Design a protein with these regions (language model features):
Chain B
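Structured aminoacyl-transfer and RNA-binding surfaces used for tRNA recognition/handling
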Residues: 20-283, 289-345
């Protein structure tokens, strides 16, 4: 049993792509070895990565495939041997199988007697197989963006391949990837180790040899070490904590081979800038961690994760450099802030004509006008339903919502659009409700994000997004497959989420009505919103898919109502009675479908003669229907479903005893009418026939 | 990943070249406390920085070119890059390129922003396998002791839609400061490149301010008297230019005349491109006839249009509806020249 090591040495791979590629490489190597019968049962596959390398170590590779015997079947025995002598057919078969004619044997199968040969297949060595197959696996790795680097463009990869290590124990596996012959020499940290090759004594010595060369190849170890170093550096400030930021941790893990952390400071005076701006500069632009004091307020420090280990003088130089860069950015931000105040938001509406929203549609000035129209319609619907909000503030917020696009601060920090508008509105005393609505207009930015807290912010967010979706669909920019360049799915997800988690008395239809959409465009958007509601229930709220299908089949307009029904149904479906009801409803649907296909008419239940079991069902259903309807009206869905479940005995008895599709058309018609009525009366909460039963 | 989309809205071709470089003169070291004096006296002057980079790369086989003498928004637009990267011929060239971004002018009042900054532009076609190591050596050559700094290559791809050009690469970060854009060109003029090339763009003002540890671009020591050590600052050399071009670009430039210039340059370029189309499609034209066709002059006309567009934009004279159309007109010229140039090289 051997250990196999593969390391692909690369120029710095984009941090965002490394984790996926590392996992894929491990999977590909494991699958290759499994497919080729070279992986020992107890084998262990470990993957490693840094910005400059992807590696996989397999402990437990067989030296070679086991030899195998294979039974080949040739021509029929009669054709192969005439009068005991081998014919040309026998000779051809023996030659093909690589055995002498004398080794052919008679094989008896169900179809008759044939000439057969037993062939020994010698297992291929791991070295030979890996040398032949592995390069294809490596070059098959998926990258979000590829490049060419060699003349003649023989291959594409994320960045140029600069060295390859491939070893079985201490021996080099002679393979070539992208023109680079594999060897046993890796490379260490660019600066701390320098250019000297890192020769590996064996595959298994990889991790420790690289550690000596100032590279931590194990991602989890680097992550742990960075977190510890962040803690340690923060402890030098009394009461301080670094602000947890998992995505940023992952980024710096994939930007470093030998991480260390420095704590830097900035002048307290910059803390007068809004925290949003400070954190954006630190996190998004500089990849620094923010530090907060014991009251969770931003403290005048930051943490930078370095890809080196410097002496005290070096650390001082590095700290000084990072501080200067950060302070310059803060100064820029302050300059922009002060500069922007010279032109209040209220004087920027006109200049939105200079900012394109979408070239076929118009400017952000046009967009604002449209948003105002949609907002007025939504506001009217909300007012009619009696929910209180400040309409004047709302319309002011809509009018000013996009004006921050003309500010220098947003031009510099585009990710702060909306937030900057809100901060400026507050600074310019435009009213707290106006400011908050503008501030919150782009939330939720993701499915995990919270919805706006203010009704005005919710309405602004809805109006802005539905206007965008309807207008984009109108010019043929609906998302297709994986392509959604205008992030319309995200916009629609936000609409659903706002309706789900707010108290707004609005439905998908009323939002769409407010947008002024009509005709085919409206139908398209309606279907799109329903699809997003399906996504929300299934993927965000984790309702079982059959519950989602059942609930939406009974109505997909009122989002919060659909959630309530899904919750009730999820709870109810576990009971045995309910399972039986679901099965029965499925049966009813099937029978009605068959009847329809055969052209059987649905008759009259009352006039027709019903068997006792059918009559019992009719009576029970008639008694129950108003009760269920009343509970449904009250949205007491759990109780309603419990009531429906009580139908089980009569439903079971009905299907046990009654032949629904009776030959007598009158009886049949009565039965059909009965079950059709049951289906209609009790499918208002969910279409139970969608429920998957055991 | 940052691409130049952000700048698209701002000011066309010249500005689009590199989102990152556009901000090179923006982000910048600020006031310091300790050891500034010591650093300043030992650090390279602005012109020594350039000398060192030039001699470093000349020693490694690069042709040293002079700055291109037509206005450009970035070193990439000079024909030594934009046209030389096309076709199969290997080439290595380095040059300092003053790069104009009229809208970025600040009358010389902002310590971090300039109307015109200087890029040291390097094209290595094809890239040597040790191109990154060479780059690191060039940093050592300008006095950066890498063992006392933190260096990272962070993903940063680049595209210039108006030139039909894009590449992948990094922004090189030194102690949190972006000092170089490193790009592997993949396409130019809408054509796949083979061989590809590496483009290194050093932001000289930014690097000089870092090395000299000064607060403002204008405090950078450009040169020092060899006898007395008395400094000549960046401000002394360039402040008047920043002020006057800001006044021109924002206040004085005559919009109607700029449009006239634009239309004239464009008309001539289009006429030449029309001729080029016929010539390079012709089976009877000789190789000599094709090779003497003045595509380099045609390209200058396109560059003129690009710069005029940027001035008009800074002047606030380009409306939303016009913008896309004008960028398209410049693209037609730039991409047209690139295609014709490739055909001419093949002739």
């Amino acid at each position: 049993m051997s250990d196999f090591l593969l390391e692909i040495g690369l120029e710095e791979v984009p941090a965002r792509m490394i984790a996926g590629a590392e996992a894929e490489l491990g999977r590909r190597v494991k699958e290759l070895l499994t497919r080729e019968r070279l992986l020992a049962a107890e084998a262990k596959v470990t993957t490693y990565s840094t910005p400059r390398r992807l590696a996989v170590l397999v402990e437990g590779v067989l030296a070679a495939q086991a030899d195998a015997e294979e039974q080949l079947t040739g021509p029929s025995w009669k054709v192969a041997f005439k009068d005991g002598a081998a014919t040309a057919a026998a000779e051809a078969f023996a030659k093909k199988a690589g055995v002498p004619v004398s080794a052919l044997e008679k094989v008896t199968t169900a179809k008759g007697e044939y000439a057969g040969a037993t062939v020994k297949r010698q297992g291929v060595s791991a070295t030979q197989l890996l040398a032949g197959e592995l390069p294809k696996e490596v070059l098959g790795l998926y990258w979000a963006k590829n490049m060419y680097w060699r003349a003649g463009k023989p291959e594409r990869f994320v960045r140029p391949v600069r060295w390859v290590v491939a070893m079985l124990d201490a021996a080099v596996v002679p393979l070539e990837i992208a023109g680079i012959a594999a060897g046993n020499a890796s490379r260490g940290h660019r600066v701390l180790h320098g250019g000297a090759p890192v020769s590996l004594a064996s595959a298994r010595s990889y991790q420790e040899a690289l550690r000596t060369a100032k590279v931590i190849v194990d991602v989890a170890e680097r992550r742990h070490s960075i977190r510890k170093a962040l803690d340690k550096a923060t402890r030098t400030v009394v009461g301080a904590r670094w602000r947890e930021d998992e995505p940023l941790v992952e980024t710096v893990v994939h930007l470093t081979e030998w991480p260390s952390v420095i704590l830097g400071d900035f002048d307290r005076e910059y803390l007068t800038l809004p925290e949003e701006v400070l954190v954006t500069v630190m996190r998004d632009h500089q990849k620094y961690f923010a530090v907060e004091d014991a009251h969770s307020k931003l403290a005048p420090h930051f943490l930078a994760v370095l890809n080196t280990e410097a002496d005290a003088d070096g650390e001082a130089i590095i700290r000084h450099g990072n501080q200067k860069v950060l302070v310059a950015r803060f100064k820029d931000a302050r300059f922009f802030w002060d500069f922007d105040q010279k032109t209040p938001l209220t004087e920027r509406v006109e200049s939105l004509k200079q900012v394109t929203f979408q070239k076929q549609l118009g400017s952000y000035h046009w967009k604002t006008e449209q948003n105002l129209g949609v907002t007025r319609a939504l506001a009217a619907a909300v007012k009619n339903a009696g929910l209180a909000f400040d309409e004047t503030a709302l319309l002011k917020a809509v009018e000013l919502a996009k004006t921050d696009l003309t500010t220098e601060l947003v031009k510099e920090f585009t990710e702060l659009q909306g937030i900057v508008g809100g901060l400026y509105a507050r600074a310019q005393h435009l009213g707290e409700r106006v400011a908050l609505a503008i501030y919150e207009q782009y939330t939720p930015a993701s499915t995990e994000d919270n919805i706006p807290v203010s009704v005005e912010g919710q309405l602004l967010g809805l109006a802005d997004r539905i206007q965008t979706i309807v207008a984009m669909f109108g010019i043929g920019n609906a998302p297709t497959g994986s392509k959604d360049p205008f992030a319309l799915r995200r916009a629609a997800n936000a609409i659903v989420k706002i309706l789900a988690e707010s108290e707004l008395p609005l439905t998908l239809d009323s939002v769409l009505d407010g947008s002024g959409a009509d005709g085919a465009n409206k139908e398209q958007v309606a279907a799109f919103l329903r699809e997003r509601l399906h996504f929300y229930l299934k993927d965000m709220r984790s309702f079982p898919y059959d519950v989602v299908n059942a609930v939406l089949a009974a109505g997909a307009n009122d989002v919060r109502d659909a959630i309530a029904r899904a919750e009730a149904l999820t709870a109810a479906r576990k009971s045995a009675d309910f399972e039986a009801i679901s099965a029965a409803f499925k049966r009813i649907k099937n029978i009605l479908r068959q009847a329809g296909e055969k052209g059987f008419a649905v008759g009259e239940a009352q006039g027709g003669k019903l068997t006792p079991e059918a009559q019992q069902l009719a009576d029970a259903a008639a008694a129950l229907a108003p009760k269920v309807a009343a509970l449904r009206e009250k949205r007491a869905y759990g109780e309603a479903l419990a009531e429906i479940a009580t139908l089980r005995p009569v439903v079971d008895a009905f299907f046990d005893k009654v032949m629904v599709l009776d030959p007598d058309p009158q009886v049949r018609g009565a039965h059909l009418s009965l079950i059709d009525g049951v289906l209609r009366s009790f499918s208002g909460i969910a279409d139970f026939s969608e429920i998957v039963t055991a | 990943m940052r691409i130049s989309i952000k700048l698209l809205g701002k000011s066309d071709t010249a500005l689009l070249i590199k989102s990152v470089l556009s901000s090179i003169e923006r982000e910048f070291p600020v006031p310091t406390t300790e050891s500034t004096a010591a650093l300043q006296s030992s650090a390279l002057t602005f012109q020594e920085l350039l000398f060192r980079l030039q001699s470093f790369w000349a020693d490694r086989g690069c042709v040293l070119q002079q700055p291109y003498d037509v206005e450009v928004g970035a070193g990439t637009m000079a024909p030594e890059t934009f046209l030389r990267v096309l076709g199969p011929k290997p080439y290595r060239v380095g040059y300092a390129q003053p790069s104009r971004r009229p809208a970025d002018g600040r009358y010389g009042e902002n310590p971090n922003r300039l109307f015109k900054h200087t890029q040291f532009q390097l094209i290595l076609k094809p890239p040597p396998v040790n191109v990154q190591e060479l780059y690191l050596q060039s940093l050592e050559a300008i006095g950066i002791d890498l063992s006392r700094h933190d260096l990272k290559f962070e993903e940063d791809n680049w595209e210039w839609p108006a030139g039909g050009a894009w590449g992948v690469g990094w922004q090189v970060m030194l102690d949190g400061l972006e000092i170089t854009q490193f790009t592997y060109f993949q396409q130019c003029g809408g054509m796949d490149l083979d061989p590809i090339c590496a483009e290194l763009t050093y932001g000289l003002e930014r690097i000089a301010a870092f090395l000299q540890d000064v607060d403002s671009i204008y405090e950078i020591v450009w040169a020092r008297d060899p006898e007395t050590g008395a400094p000549v600052t960046y401000g002394e050399v360039r402040l008047a230019e920043e002020l006057q071009f800001s006044v021109y670009n924002f206040e004085e430039a005559d919009v109607a005349k700029l449009w006239e210039h634009f239309n004239l340059f464009e008309a001539e370029a289009k006429e030449l491109l029309g001729k080029a189309d016929g010539l390079f499609a012709s089976e009877t034209a000789s190789a000599g006839e094709k090779q003497r066709f003045p595509l380099l002059a045609t390209y200058e006309l396109a560059l003129k249009c690009s710069n005029l567009f940027n001035v008009l934009d800074a002047r606030g004279a380009i409306s939303v509806t016009e913008r896309v159309g004008v960028i398209g007109r410049i693209r037609a010229l730039a991409v047209g020249v690139a295609r014709a140039y490739a055909a001419q090289q093949a002739a």
